[in-house]
């Protein structure tokens, strides 16, 4: 995207407050035209002094004009500041809403820190450009448009000096833009790397300290800052050179105007006041040209980050689903995978030709070694990814033909990572159901064996859990996540190692709760516990992305196939009595898979 198109697109965001924007633009244009009269009035003051005539009236008019101009500029600048800040926050809110609504694959491809950094830096740059446009850019272009014919009317020979000056500014700016284009893109790249490293290190500060990586992480940051400075220094040098060349050109131009003006005064072709007026025009033009140079500097330095933002914005619009997609009606929970294949880009991993059917209310245990495709299968159901071949249906409806919002309403997921916000316990659980009553909240936490430990906290349900639940134990975090899913009361429940962080006693209670809420509800469990697999209606055994075996627990045992051999390698006794003591003894299937 060219610099001009980038600039126009940035300004297009001001259309959201069109009336205020047009009012400020009109005031700016008026000010720009009126500003040109100031050197003319000052020239008249000089002429009245030279003629020894009454200067009081002319001087008073000039002073009043100058003061009024200052007041008007302050009012316009105030309005521009407010409008720019309002628009910045509006763009931030709308972009944020689009970003968090994107599929998870979109975020995984870009990275959280990259999207955050792009959004914040771009909105800051847009705010600066809006401010400069409403304060200076528009009035500068208008002033130059009016100033050129006025100066030519006064004295075309002196005007040529100013035209040469303008051409020099343009040539210098063009040269610097060409020299810094690639450098500015590199600067933005290193900015992202720097921000990514800081975010990554701070978010994993416990690992950094545990493995005594403070010196190494600081050294790596130092390398990132050196890379940034190495890329930024040449860019800054070029703009410093441009500033010096512009200043030299403007000084030479003023000297030429004064010398030529003095020559014309001696010849009687100009008065002293007219020369002063023309010098004022020269200074006004130099000031406007300096503003244009500053604007070009701002636009060029912002282009790379704005281009990234626009690419991100465009990708959100392209990824957006059609507005007229229907919703899932009265979900019962019958799910079917129809020859589903998904392969990760630039990888041979994924899932391949998966077909199975789950009746409404059944519990499905997904089993397999690490990297077998268990989580990928669940992600396809949640439309984190869309199949490259085949499709998935809920109650006979292709989930690609419905809107994502209704699909998400039908699913309640408990991940291995509880995923808590830095908010209160109440807020974190209430995410499951907006507007839930206290009674519903308490019932959910009691079912998840969370109510008792919550009451022991300093502020009970109003206790802050810290960033990602850092103020809670692993088991406490997991129970809150389960309570959140219980509160949502969705017809389809997904548990990704949901009880892996719990002690045996708590796991028994939570397992009973899960068994309770699984009644009349389709449940998918990524299973690593033998007790979970035994109780499932359907067991899916995956390996290397393929569905190797499926059936009930006993059916797979009777097959004497891969699943049975896996259990046997783990040294587990299959035909032991299913007493409560034995059934609730948590035997890690993961151990068998590792053998």
Curated annotation (Swiss-Prot):
It comes from Bartonella bacilliformis. Involved in beta-(1-->2)glucan export. Transmembrane domains (TMD) form a pore in the inner membrane and the ATP-binding domain (NBD) is responsible for energy generation. Its main location: membrane. NCBIfam families: chvA, PRK13657.1. GO terms for cellular component: plasma membrane. Residues 335-569 form the ABC transporter domain. It comes from the Bacteria. One of its GO terms (molecular function) is ATP binding. This is Beta-(1-->2)glucan export ATP-binding/permease protein NdvA. The chain crosses the membrane at residues 21-41, 56-76, 129-149, 158-178, 252-272. It is a multi-pass membrane protein. It is found in: Cell inner membrane. The keyword Ribosomal protein does not apply. Homodimer. Keywords: ATP-binding, Cell inner membrane, Cell membrane, Membrane, Nucleotide-binding, Sugar transport, Translocase, Transmembrane, Transmembrane helix, Transport.
């Amino acid at each position: 995207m060219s610099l001009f198109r980038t600039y126009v697109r940035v300004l297009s965001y001001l259309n959201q407050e069109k009336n205020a924007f047009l009012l400020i633009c009109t005031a700016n244009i008026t000010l720009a035209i009126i500003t040109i009269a100031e050197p003319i009035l000052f020239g008249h003051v000089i002429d009245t002094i030279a003629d020894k005539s009454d200067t009081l009236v002319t001087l008073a008019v000039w002073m009043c004009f100058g003061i009024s101009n200052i007041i008007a500029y302050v009012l316009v600048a105030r309005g521009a500041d407010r409008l720019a800040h309002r628009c910045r926050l509006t763009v931030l809110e709308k972009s944020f809403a689009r970003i968090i609504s994107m599929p998870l694959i979109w975020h995984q491809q870009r990275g959280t820190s990259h999207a955050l950094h792009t959004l914040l830096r771009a909105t800051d740059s847009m705010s600066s450009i809006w401010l400069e446009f409403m304060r200076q850019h528009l009035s500068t272009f208008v002033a130059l448009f009016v100033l050129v014919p006025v100066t030519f009317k006064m004295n075309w020979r002196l005007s040529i000096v100013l035209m040469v000056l303008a051409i020099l500014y343009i040539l210098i700016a063009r040269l610097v833009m060409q020299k810094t284009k690639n450098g500015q893109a590199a600067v933005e790249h290193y900015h992202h790397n720097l921000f990514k490293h800081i975010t990554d290190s701070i978010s994993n500060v416990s690992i950094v300290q545990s493995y005594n990586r403070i010196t190494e992480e600081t050294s790596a940051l130092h390398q990132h800052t050196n890379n940034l400075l190495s890329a930024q220094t040449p860019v800054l040098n070029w703009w410093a050179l441009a500033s010096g060349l512009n200043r030299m050109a403007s000084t030479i131009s003023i000297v030429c105007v004064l010398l030529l003006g003095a020559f014309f005064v001696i010849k009687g072709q100009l008065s002293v006041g007219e020369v002063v007026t023309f010098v004022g025009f020269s200074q006004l033009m130099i000031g406007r040209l300096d503003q244009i140079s500053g604007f070009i500097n701002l636009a060029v330095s912002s282009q790379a980050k704005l281009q990234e933002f626009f690419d991100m914005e465009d990708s959100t619009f392209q990824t957006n689903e059609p507005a007229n997609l229907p919703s899932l009606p009265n979900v019962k929970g019958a799910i079917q995978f129809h020859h589903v294949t998904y392969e990760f880009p630039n990888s041979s991993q994924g899932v391949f030709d998966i077909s199975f059917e789950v009746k409404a209310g059944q519990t499905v245990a997904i089993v397999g070694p690490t990297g077998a495709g268990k989580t990928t299968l669940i992600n396809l159901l949640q439309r984190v990814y869309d199949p490259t071949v085949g499709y998935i249906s809920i109650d006979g409806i292709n989930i690609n033909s419905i809107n994502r919002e209704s699909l998400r309403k039908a699913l309640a997921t408990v991940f291995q990572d509880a995923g808590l916000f830095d908010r209160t316990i109440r807020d974190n659980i209430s995410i499951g159901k907006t507007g839930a009553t206290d009674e519903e909240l308490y019932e959910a936490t009691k079912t998840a064996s969370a109510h008792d430990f919550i009451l022991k906290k300093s502020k009970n349900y109003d206790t802050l859990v810290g960033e990602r639940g850092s103020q809670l134990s692993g088991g406490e975090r997991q129970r809150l996540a389960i309570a959140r899913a219980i509160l949502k009361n969705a017809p389809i429940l997904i548990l990704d190692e949901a009880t892996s962080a719990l002690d045996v006693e708590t796991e028994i209670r939570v397992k009973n709760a899960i068994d309770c809420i699984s009644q009349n509800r389709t449940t998918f469990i990524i299973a690593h516990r033998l007790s979970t697999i035994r109780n499932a209606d359907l067991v899916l055994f995956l390996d290397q992305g393929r569905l190797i075996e499926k059936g009930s627990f006993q059916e797979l045992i009777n097959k004497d196939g891969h699943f049975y051999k896996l259990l046997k390698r783990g040294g587990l006794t299959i035909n032991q009595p299913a007493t409560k003591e034995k059934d609730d003894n948590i035997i890690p299937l993961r151990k068998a898979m590792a053998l």
